[in-house]
């Protein structure tokens, strides 16, 4: 059900998701790009079919939001009843994950520390980390400066000893 309109691209399942599904389902099989495209189109058509039917069921029950129950009824009415048990399992997993997320976000609220105080503490930690980083950078710079000075002194000392050695050689040449 692909068309040339730009909107259809927004309504397809991401290729990465399809590729992952194919690889998990058929791990030792190579699948041609045309076959992958066909799977994308079939999945998109299936989703459109189910969502349209669920929307009709939702409208008939005078609701404004499609619920999971509407989708399950749509599967049944379209002859996909064999999918319902698995759909219900996935729905339960999604609800569990959502509940865990809500609990995790409420943990922050239940800390008893206002968000402004947490932000202030975070800013203090960032400032302390920046200060420590600046001190380390300063120490490294000083060490590099000292190493450069030592190298200059060593070079000057070597140059002076070379000049002293060559002037003594000239004095020795004068004696001949």
UniProtKB/Swiss-Prot annotation:
One of its GO terms (cellular component) is RNA polymerase II transcription regulator complex. Residues 152-167 have a biased composition (Low complexity). The association of the DR1/DRAP1 heterodimer with TBP results in a functional repression of both activated and basal transcription of class II genes. This interaction precludes the formation of a transcription-competent complex by inhibiting the association of TFIIA and/or TFIIB with TBP. Can bind to DNA on its own. Component of the ATAC complex, a complex with histone acetyltransferase activity on histones H3 and H4. The lineage of its organism: Eukaryota, Metazoa, Chordata, Craniata, Vertebrata. The modification Phosphoserine is found at residues 105-106, 166-167. This is Protein Dr1. Its main location: nucleus. Phosphorylation regulates its interaction with TBP. Not phosphorylated when bound to DRAP1. Heterodimer with DRAP1. DR1 exists in solution as a homotetramer that dissociates during interaction with TBP and then, after complexing with TBP, reassociates at a slow rate, to reconstitute the tetramer. Component of the ADA2A-containing complex (ATAC), composed of KAT14, KAT2A, TADA2L, TADA3L, ZZ3, MBIP, WDR5, YEATS2, CCDC101 and DR1. A motif (Nuclear localization signal) lies at residues 100-103. Residues 152-176 are annotated as: Disordered. Belongs to the NC2 beta/DR1 family. Residues 12-75 form the Histone-fold domain. The gene is Dr1. It is found in: Nucleus. GO terms for molecular function: DNA binding; protein heterodimerization activity; RNA polymerase II general transcription initiation factor activity; TBP-class protein binding. Keywords: Acetylation, DNA-binding, Nucleus, Phosphoprotein, Repressor, Transcription, Transcription regulation. The modification N-acetylalanine is found at residue 2. One of its GO terms (biological process) is negative regulation of transcription by RNA polymerase II. The keyword Disulfide bond does not apply. It comes from the Eukaryota.
